[in-house]
């Protein structure tokens, strides 16, 4: 009875391990990272465009009645977007690195569990073989004694 109970617990652990592994390696979890990278790219492009326009306003290439105010606004918004894009890029890189580390740790843990399960199985098989050998020796010695 104990052997059956231990076997069912081992099967539950295997099922839990497989579910965790599938959840960690699911590529749909990486979708927010792609969206964040797209937002960072758009913000960077917009910031560079605003900074170029502001530079053209300041240099006088583009004429506007309120060129200094418009140029200051473009510089401010462009710098804000560029800073936001920089911070967003750093945070996205950090999130991707953390996710990859988590995946590699999960894979290593899964490999360790599989190796441990194989060793446990070999040990239980060896102990079962030893018990059957002992029984066989006992039965042979009893037959030899009679």
UniProtKB/Swiss-Prot annotation:
<keyword id="KW-0964">Secreted</keyword>
<protein>
    <recommendedName>
        <fullName>Inclusion membrane protein D</fullName>
    </recommendedName>
</protein>
<dbReference type="GO" id="GO:0140221">
    <property type="term" value="C:pathogen-containing vacuole membrane"/>
</dbReference>
<dbReference type="GO" id="GO:0005576">
    <property type="term" value="C:extracellular region"/>
</dbReference>
<dbReference type="Pfam" id="PF17628">
    <property type="entry name" value="IncD"/>
</dbReference>
<dbReference type="InterPro" id="IPR035117">
    <property type="entry name" value="IncD"/>
</dbReference>
<keyword id="KW-1133">Transmembrane helix</keyword>
<keyword id="KW-1043">Host membrane</keyword>
<feature type="transmembrane region" description="Helical">
    <location>
        <begin position="68"/>
        <end position="88"/>
    </location>
</feature>
<keyword id="KW-0472">Membrane</keyword>
<keyword id="KW-0812">Transmembrane</keyword>
<comment type="function">
    <text>Host inclusion membrane protein probably involved in early modification events of the chlamydial inclusion.</text>
</comment>
<keyword id="KW-0843">Virulence</keyword>
<feature type="transmembrane region" description="Helical">
    <location>
        <begin position="38"/>
        <end position="58"/>
    </location>
</feature>
<dbReference type="GO" id="GO:0033644">
    <property type="term" value="C:host cell membrane"/>
</dbReference>
């Amino acid at each position: 009875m104990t052997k059956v109970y231990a076997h069912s617990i081992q099967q539950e652990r295997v099922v839990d391990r497989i579910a965790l592994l599938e959840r960690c390696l699911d590529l749909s979890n990486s979708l927010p990272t792609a969206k964040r990278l797209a937002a960072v790219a758009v913000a960077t492009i917009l910031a560079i465009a605003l900074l170029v326009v502001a530079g053209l306003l300041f240099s006088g290439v583009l004429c506007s009645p309120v060129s200094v105010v418009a140029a200051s606004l473009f510089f401010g918004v462009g710098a804000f977007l560029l800073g936001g894009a920089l911070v967003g890029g750093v945070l996205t890189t950090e999130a991707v690195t953390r996710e990859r580390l988590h995946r590699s740790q999960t894979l290593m843990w899964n490999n360790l569990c599989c190796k441990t399960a194989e060793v446990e199985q070999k040990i239980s098989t060896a102990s079962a073989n030893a018990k059957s050998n002992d029984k066989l020796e006992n039965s042979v010695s009893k037959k030899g004694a009679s």
